[in-house]
Structures are given as C-alpha cells and as structure tokens.
C-alpha cells in the first residue's frame, strides 16, 4: 500500500523545487459538506437503510430514481414513504453541483463549469463522437502534480473531490443529453486533477457508474489516466479491471520528462516503464501513452525514434496530442507537418499511433482552461 502522507510530502517538495514557488496543499480534513447520495454503491446504500430502520430493498428503488428516472428532488421518489424521503433529504444532497457556465462548441462539444457546495469550481466536458457521447470528468479541485504545460495546475490543489461529486458530473451531463434523447456511452477520467492521487474516490466512482443499477457504463468504455504515480499503477493493475488505462508520458527520456513533469523526479522513467510492463502482463490489456507535442521540446523525428525504442515490445498505443495554448505557459503547439512527421516515424517503427482529434477549441474546452479563465476574470 502507498503511504499517502509521505507521497503528498514528496510531490509537494518536488513541485516547489521545480516551480520555485509554494504549492497550495490540499486540505487534510474532509470539507464540511452534505454527503452526496450519488456516493453510494448499492450495497452501501442497503447498509445505510438497515442502520436507519428501513428495508434494504429500497436501495434498488432509490437507484432507479437516481439513474433511470434522474429525478432532481427526493420528493419525486413517489414509491418511497414520506418518512424515508425526509430521512434522505436530511442526510444527503441530491445536487452538489450547480452550473455556472455551459458553453457549446460549433463541433457539438459542451463544456460545463460547475460550482461545488463550498464555492470551488470544476470543469466537465461532453465530447461527441461517431461511436457515442464521451464525458471527461474532473477528480480534484486543481492539481498539485505541476506539469509545466498544463492549465490545471495553475493555482495548485484545493481539495480532492468526493466520489459523489465525480458521479454527479456524469449525471448532470446525462440530464442535458436527456433533452435530445441521447445517452452517455463513454467516460474518460482525464479532467482536472490526478485520478491516482484521489484513488479511493476514483475507485468508488468507477464502481457506481459501471454498476448495472447505476449508470451501467461498460468497463471497456471507461478510461482512466495517470501522470505516473508508480505504486498506484501496481495497485490498479492488481484490481484486474477491464477499464482502459492511459499514462501521460510526454517525453522519452528522464531529463526531458522531469522538465515537463516534476513527478518524474519522484518516480523515474525506468520505474514508470517497469510498472507499465507489470500492468500489461497482469491484466493482458494494452496501455495508451498520452504524448503532448510541443514545438522544439519533444517533437523532433529523433525524439520519435527514442520514443519508439522506449516502448517497443510493450502492448501499447500512442495518442499524439497537439498541446493547447495556455497564456500562463511558454509552450507552443507543434506544426501540423511536424505532427505528421512524428506520427510517420512511430508507424515506421511498428508503433500503433493516432493523432487526437481536436474538439471544443473555440470554447476553451481543454483541461483547466475554462476554470482558469473564470478565476482570472474574478481577480480583475
């Protein structure tokens, strides 16, 4: 098991060294919030009902109201007694997120900025594809990993999200899709924050949305990404889930990676690759390497050759991502011609590779951008 306290201290120290400024630490205590009803797995809700003098079969009825009928008040749960509805309302929140901004791109992408009960804001993105509707969820308010090209780390980490706050992002998006008779078919845990830094809440979220009585989203339609918290990769591999797994790599050698990603100082590239090999061997599943291309930093043909050598023999796929412009960062997006040259080199070396389709650029849909814009406007 990971010593979370030591890990927190280690990453905070490394990010402070890399950024030369203090990192805002997450609150150690849980915020004083009303617990979301969406935090429960069915058996957990059954236990709560029994402890409060109610029949456990009511859990299935409550789940039906939450995930099939998608009610917005406890009063709408008409097959429950008034007494039970009152108990639920007294103990839980049915809505912990309120919509601050909802923007729709010309390509159909919808970006949501939600406000939490304690006033913090988070982002969620609905992306439309030929194969269905994908939701990118956030797992933390801010991020402390400190990647030097990312908008999510601006302002540091405020707190971890609770499982119900992550689930409710998907529910809110589904309520929007209900208006056009569509459904959420895919989930990517690639929004603001490091999912493996909020591991328990992430796992609870996965079990709720994957459950047949929950949102019933198939495991193979869910992808979780990490910046490279090595001990958690081993733990995730041992879970033996059918969920897709991605690693934010962004560089093929230790020196370049730790410049872009301070976490590489805590967990060296060779340690990360060893953990990835363990994952593929343990699960039999491939890993996706997320690779953000930045002009003059990590996009040369020579670096593509180095990347090919690094991952050769691993059951994997490379997802090339042209980085988005972030005003507070100095990196420049790689040219289209260089992106294609990089892709061609990987393919020549037998690497399975795709270029991520850009979506929602006209509404700041990249991770952390809308939240950063809102924070900037608030401080003017």
Swiss-Prot record:
Disulphides: 136-367
Keyword Nucleus on entry: no
Family annotation (InterPro entries): Aldolase_TIM, Methyltransferase_A, RlmN_N, RNA_MTrfase_RlmN, rRNA_lsu_MTrfase_RlmN/Cfr, rSAM
Subcellular location(s) of the protein: Cytoplasm
Domain Radical SAM core: 129-362
Cofactor binding note from Swiss-Prot or TrEMBL: Binds 1 [4Fe-4S] cluster. The cluster is coordinated with 3 cysteines and an exchangeable S-adenosyl-L-methionine.
One Pfam family from the record: Radical_SAM
GO CC field: cytoplasm
Protein name per its UniProtKB record: Probable dual-specificity RNA methyltransferase RlmN
Residues engaged in binding S-adenosyl-L-methionine: 193-194, 225, 248-250, 324
Naturally occurring in which organism (per UniProt): Lysinibacillus sphaericus (strain C3-41)
Ranges annotated as spanning the membrane: none
SUPFAM superfamilies associated with the record: Radical SAM enzymes
Note from the entry: Reaction proceeds by a ping-pong mechanism involving intermediate methylation of a conserved cysteine residue.
BP term (GO), one: rRNA base methylation
PROSITE patterns membership: RADICAL_SAM
Chief location bin: cytoplasm
Requisite cofactors: [4Fe-4S] cluster
Gene Ontology molecular function terms on file: 4 iron, 4 sulfur cluster binding; metal ion binding; rRNA (adenine(2503)-C2-)-methyltransferase activity; rRNA binding; tRNA (adenine(37)-C2)-methyltransferase activity; tRNA binding
Catalytic activity from the UniProt record: adenosine(2503) in 23S rRNA + 2 reduced [2Fe-2S]-[ferredoxin] + 2 S-adenosyl-L-methionine = 2-methyladenosine(2503) in 23S rRNA + 5'-deoxyadenosine + L-methionine + 2 oxidized [2Fe-2S]-[ferredoxin] + S-adenosyl-L-homocysteine; adenosine(37) in tRNA + 2 reduced [2Fe-2S]-[ferredoxin] + 2 S-adenosyl-L-methionine = 2-methyladenosine(37) in tRNA + 5'-deoxyadenosine + L-methionine + 2 oxidized [2Fe-2S]-[ferredoxin] + S-adenosyl-L-homocysteine
Superkingdom to which the source organism belongs: Bacteria
EC number: 2.1.1.192
HAMAP family cross-referenced by the UniProt entry: RNA_methyltr_RlmN (MF_01849)
Catalytic site: 123 (proton acceptor), 367 (s-methylcysteine intermediate)
